[in-house]
Every structure is written in structure tokens, then in C-alpha cells.
A protein has these predicted regions:
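Solvent-exposed, polar/charged alpha-helical surfaces in well-ordered, non-transmembrane soluble domains
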Residues: 28-29, 33, 73, 77, ...
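Periplasmic/extracellular electron-transfer cofactor-ligation site
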Residues: 28-56, 81-90, 114-120
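Electrostatic cytochrome c docking/interface patches
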Residues: 15-30
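Bacterial N-terminal signal peptides
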Residues: 7-17
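Axial heme c-ligation environment in periplasmic c-type cytochrome domains
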Residues: 57-60, 65, 74, 78-105, ...
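Positively charged n-region of N-terminal signal peptides that target proteins for export
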Residues: 1-5
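Short, solvent-exposed loop/helix junctions and linker helices
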Residues: 24, 68-70, 101
Length: 120
């Protein structure tokens, strides 16, 4: 009986700890699919779709000094409503009809991890 309890407890613990990393992996997949094409897989603004013809460079999420100036509300708004929603580039598309509110919040948290910064 105690062997069963120990095995069950260990399995439950592993499952719960894997859930957090699964969510992190899912968020990375979201970022890679929707954001990395322009912002780069490292978030440095050097995505594979960026050309010299871009009117402006995509935001470098790893630049902590710049990203600290951006409020969470502004970043959330840009993800949902596109660049023009905060007077930024129209090349940044709106994802509000595609992503859930929870996914937008997950991407926001992921972006904050990339810059290792806090909102203003």
C-alpha cells in the first residue's frame, strides 16, 4: 500500500511540474509562430522576414532599457490591435481576433522575460 502511495505521489508531482514547463513550451511556440518571423526567435528584432526595405526595424525585446519604457498595457494593445494602436508601425499586425486574452497575457510575460525588465 505505501509503495502505491509513494508511486502515485511521485507521478502526480512529476505531472504537475511538467504542466508549468508545458505552458512555457506552448508560449514559446506561440511566440515562434506569431512573433519570431519579424522579432526573431531570440526576440532581438532580427526575424527571417525582416528586409532592408522595412520602414522601421521590429522591436528588439532584448533591449531592457527600451522595453522598460513600454507599459504592459501598450504591449498588450500592440499584440491585440497592431502597431497603429499606439502610433507605431502598421507592419505590426493585430492578433486580437486570433489569440485569446490568456495567450496575449502569456506572450506579454514571455516578452518581459526576454528583456529581463519590468514595466514602467
Amino acid at each position: 500500500m505505501s509503495r502505491f502511495v509513494i508511486t502515485t505521489t511521485m507521478a502526480l508531482g512529476l505531472a504537475l511540474s511538467a504542466g508549468g514547463s508545458a505552458q512555457a513550451a506552448d508560449t514559446k511556440q506561440l511566440f515562434d509562430f506569431y512573433c519570431a518571423q519579424c522579432h526573431g526567435t531570440a526576440g532581438d528584432g532580427k526575424g527571417i522576414n525582416v528586409t532592408k526595405d522595412f520602414a522601421t526595424d521590429p522591436r528588439n525585446f532584448t533591449n531592457a532599457a527600451d522595453m522598460e519604457k513600454r507599459s504592459d498595457d501598450d504591449i498588450r494593445s500592440v499584440i491585440k490591435d497592431g502597431g497603429p494602436s499606439i502610433s507605431k508601425s502598421p507592419l505590426m499586425p493585430p492578433w486580437g481576433a486570433t489569440l485569446s486574452a490568456a495567450e496575449v497575457d502569456e506572450l506579454l510575460a514571455y516578452i518581459r522575460k526576454l528583456c529581463k525588465c519590468k514595466a514602467k
